[in-house]
Amino acid sequence: MPKGRQKVPHLDAPLGLPTCLWLELAGLFLLVPWVMGLAGTGGPDGQGTGGPSWAVHLESLEGDGEEETLEQQADALAQAAGLVNAGRIGELQGHYLFVQPAGHRPALEVEAIRQQVEAVLAGHEAVRWHSEQRLLRRAKRSVHFNDPKYPQQWHLNNRRSPGRDINVTGVWERNVTGRGVTVVVVDDGVEHTIQDIAPNYSPEGSYDLNSNDPDPMPHPDVENGNHHGTRCAGEIAAVPNNSFCAVGVAYGSRIAGIRVLDGPLTDSMEAVAFNKHYQINDIYSCSWGPDDDGKTVDGPHQLGKAALQHGVIAGRQGFGSIFVVASGNGGQHNDNCNYDGYANSIYTVTIGAVDEEGRMPFYAEECASMLAVTFSGGDKMLRSIVTTDWDLQKGTGCTEGHTGTSAAAPLAAGMIALMLQVRPCLTWRDVQHIIVFTATRYEDRRAEWVTNEAGFSHSHQHGFGLLNAWRLVNAAKIWTSVPYLASYVSPVLKENKAIPQSPRSLEVLWNVSRMDLEMSGLKTLEHVAVTVSITHPRRGSLELKLFCPSGMMSLIGAPRSMDSDPNGFNDWTFSTVRCWGERARGTYRLVIRDVGDESFQVGILRQWQLTLYGSVWSAVDIRDRQRLLESAMSGKYLHDDFALPCPPGLKIPEEDGYTITPNTLKTLVLVGCFTVFWTVYYMLEVYLSQRNVASNQVCRSGPCHWPHRSRKAKEEGTELESVPLCSSKDPDEVETESRGPPTTSDLLAPDLLEQGDWSLSQNKSALDCPHQHLDVPHGKEEQIC
């Protein structure tokens, strides 16, 4: 067997797959440093070496500015600095990123390299600017709260049904939280010490009208029901990230409270509440109104109406207080919010409700004055509003059961606070216009949508649609104020016409001509109001419809089966917003009919009056504004660098900040009583003292003998102190009894009479005895007193 090389099984065997893989991995391992060292030449976007890097702005030394020339300069400069040119930075011409080749280096070596690079770049004539790149901390703009009930706040962020919420998270991500705005809840009080409200509480905007002190803390009651105001306040401004309960829609705003519903309420108290601290409070949230029983016709009385008007004129430095009111919860009683004077007012923002499925809840009311709707609770199978609650009595500080239009109005108030943060100079009419322009129409089988002449869709069930925080805030950011409020009031139109039963009807007309509107300049409508006086045996059987010149119909007075009042209407004002943006000129028709079964007595339209409110805007102006707002919905204007100038507000005199508290009042009453007591006591003491002096006098009325000297008194050393001042007898035989009231001389001090000069006593005698002197024998001095 010939000699040969001994076989080594492991080496002589054919290379299998595992062996090849090991060789490939070894090769890659050896190539990694080389690859990483050259990776920087691929461009700055993929750079991730972790070492120092510099941004450098170069200009061509040859003056041509060509990109190829600049690229060559950048390569040479980077090499001179011991760096690698990673390429141009984005689309910025002449800007390059220089990076240090990868490799572990001690900290001292890195610092030496940094100094060397800085020296090279600073001394090169082609370098216009350079800067070492630092790591920047950036966070994703997403909203995360640790409040335990925030995931259940579907109305803020509906994860179960995306889109069925108020669309507010994008606004929060841009740091719009209501900062700088104060919302006041006019209700039964606000528990401001609870941790969800305390950090945002505004004591300077608060007051208790029920107890007449500055603290609106709710009082426990038998029904455990005075939590209403606290719940509304939590919806607006509950503090986030405090690991407690929930989050408010405008959690950066201030929240105040006016306690007025926990006791008897008068017209004057309402008036005070509507204007209380109206240079501090921007928005008044009012989740209350007349009884929702389907038979009440009521609203603010004379003082309340005046306060609402004064608030929109002088409140908020002249931009106008924003009054947000709930439309009412009388739907199950077939009630209608046109019979609610607060919802019917042109000075308020009337807000209705929809449930989480976007449908009209069973309790919601309809009316022609409805401006918009937002979310609230529905039937028992649907979720209600999660918000802060009081922790008094049976309260736990948090609730998942807030519902009704009472829950919808505070959400609207919070969204308006977001609007005022980005545009503080919005007027009360600007807010109404933005709601009309941005509310979104949606389908509901109960809603009857009609598009008016100006292109706005409205339904009696949902107003102009659902409030959308994103649309409201973006529109507010670029909004310029509407022109002045123009109005037209017709004469009182006396009719005295019978109202027939259905299907017949009474129709009355009034034409508004161009000449009628010349004085005010009114062109397009906002609110239209009709004031009627009607007698009818059953008020709830009446149906009133108003037709604007365009033909747009408003059901301003809906029949109500539970309203059997026999007095009809006495100067009651109905209003509608359904003709918003339409032309004001033309013929208005009021159509009334009796839909009841009673035929024993006919109703009479005594008189009516038409009032138009609007502006000098034309139809073209409205269309231009619509296009402008739609262009802003991308959010391109919603950043701090863009801001339209705001006109300065009016200098409204501040309110007197001093308040008499009950304790102060009690103290003043006690001090007053004490003062009266001592005054009476002192007067009684003086009176008794004078009577005592008078009883001790011995002066008689009649002839008065004025001796020059009492010899007996002189001898006894008592001078004249024991001698009567006036006597018809000798002083030594003076009688001690008094026969009449004392005279002026009776009350003279004895030490004055003991002096040698008797002119005083003689003069006093003349004062006491003003009658003429009688001629008497020499040596006697007598007078007839």
From Swiss-Prot:
Transmembrane spans: 668-688
Propeptide: 38-141
Pfam families: P_proprotein (PF01483), Peptidase_S8 (PF00082), S8_pro-domain (PF16470)
Highest taxon, organism lineage: Eukaryota
InterPro entries the UniProt entry points to: Galactose-bd-like_sf, Kexin/furin, P_dom, Peptidase_S8/S53_dom, Peptidase_S8/S53_dom_sf, Peptidase_S8_His-AS, Peptidase_S8_Ser-AS, Peptidase_S8_subtilisin-rel
Domain named P/Homo B: residues: 481-618
Domain Peptidase S8, first and last residues per copy: 153-473
Expression by tissue: Expressed in spleen, thymus, prostate, testis, ovary, small intestine, colon and peripheral blood leukocyte.
Catalytic site positions: 187, 228, 406
EC code: 3.4.21.-
Regulation: Inhibited by zinc and copper.
Glycosites: 167, 175, 241, 511
Site note Cleavage, residues: 141-142
Description of post-translational modifications: Cysteine residues in the cytoplasmic tail are probably palmitoylated. N-glycosylated.
Keywords assigned by UniProt, alphabetized: Cleavage on pair of basic residues, Glycoprotein, Golgi apparatus, Hydrolase, Lipoprotein, Membrane, Palmitate, Protease, Serine protease, Signal, Transmembrane, Transmembrane helix, Zymogen
Membrane topology: Single-pass type I membrane protein
Disordered as annotated region, ranges: 197-219, 700-751
Biological processes annotated in GO: peptide hormone processing; protein processing
Extracellular face residues: 142-667
Segments in the Cytoplasmic topological domain: 689-785
Signal peptide: 1-37
Cofactor section: Ca(2+)
Annotated function: Serine endoprotease that processes various proproteins by cleavage at paired basic amino acids, recognizing the RXXX[KR]R consensus motif. Likely functions in the constitutive secretory pathway.
Protein name: Proprotein convertase subtilisin/kexin type 7
Gene giving rise to this polypeptide: PCSK7
